[in-house]
Amino acid sequence: MMVYIMNAFDIKSTKMDVLSISLHTSDLFDLEDVLVKLGKKFQESGVVPFVLDVQEFDYPESLDLAALVSLFSRHGMQILGLKHSNERWAAAAMKYHLLFCLSHSENVKELGQVEVQNTEDGQKARKTVLITSPVRTGQQVYAEDGDLIVTGAVSQGAELIADGNIHIYAPMRGRALAGAKGDTSARIFIHSMQAELVSVAGIYRNFEQDLPNHLHKQPVQILLQDNRLVISAIGSE
C-alpha cells in the first residue's frame, strides 16, 4: 500500500461555549428595550459570543444585519455567525465577516442515532448529518457530536467540520476538519482528493501544491498515526 505521510503543526484546540440567539423580530427599537435590561448581565461578564439564528426570516434583506450586529455588540453580545437552513444567507454572512452555519433543512437530514460500541465511559450515541447539496465558497457545515456525510461537491473556501468522521462522496476542494473536539481516532474519507486543507484532532496539513498522482483527484482516507497525518489511497495494496 502506498502511503503519503505528512508532518504537520500541532494545534491545541480550545473549547468555547457559544450560545444561540433565535431572532423573532427585526424591530431594532424592540430589541434595544430588551437588550438594555438583558445586556447588563453580559456586560458584567465581558463580551459574550453568540450565533444569531435567523431561521424565521426568509431573506437577508428582511434584516439590517449591520445594525443588528452593532446593537448586540454595544450591549456586550458579540455575534460570531448566522444560522439558517437556506444557503442564500451565506453571502450575507460573508459580507459582514460572520461565520455561516447551515441548520437542518430538506437538504440536511439527521440519519438518527448510531450506537456506540463502548458505553462504559459514558459516551453519547453518535449522530450523523447528511448534506445532499453542494457546499459553496464561504459556507461552513458543522456536525456536532457526530459524523458528517456530504454527497455534493465542496468548493474551494468552503469548510466542513465534524466532531467525528467526515465522508465526502464528491470532488473536495475546500477544508475538512474531523475530530474537532480532539477525537484522534476520527478519519476523513474523500472520493476525489483536491482539498486545500485537512485536519484531524487539530493536526492539519495545508496543500499549496497538488499531491502525487496516486492521491490527487483519487479516493483517499486521512487519519492520524503517531501524531502525524497519513494520507493513503483507498483500495491500494
Swiss-Prot record:
A biological process (GO) annotation for this entry? regulation of cell division
Q: Tell whether Cell division is among the UniProt keywords.
A: yes
Presence of keyword Plastid? no
Q: Which UniProt keywords apply?
A: Cell cycle, Cell division, Septation
What family name appears in the similarity comment?
Answer: Belongs to the MinC family.
Q: What does this protein do?
A: Cell division inhibitor that blocks the formation of polar Z ring septums. Rapidly oscillates between the poles of the cell to destabilize FtsZ filaments that have formed before they mature into polar Z rings. Prevents FtsZ polymerization.
| NCBIfam families tied to this protein | minC
How it assembles, according to the record, is: Interacts with MinD and FtsZ.
HAMAP family listed in its UniProt record: MinC
**Name assigned to this protein:** Probable septum site-determining protein MinC
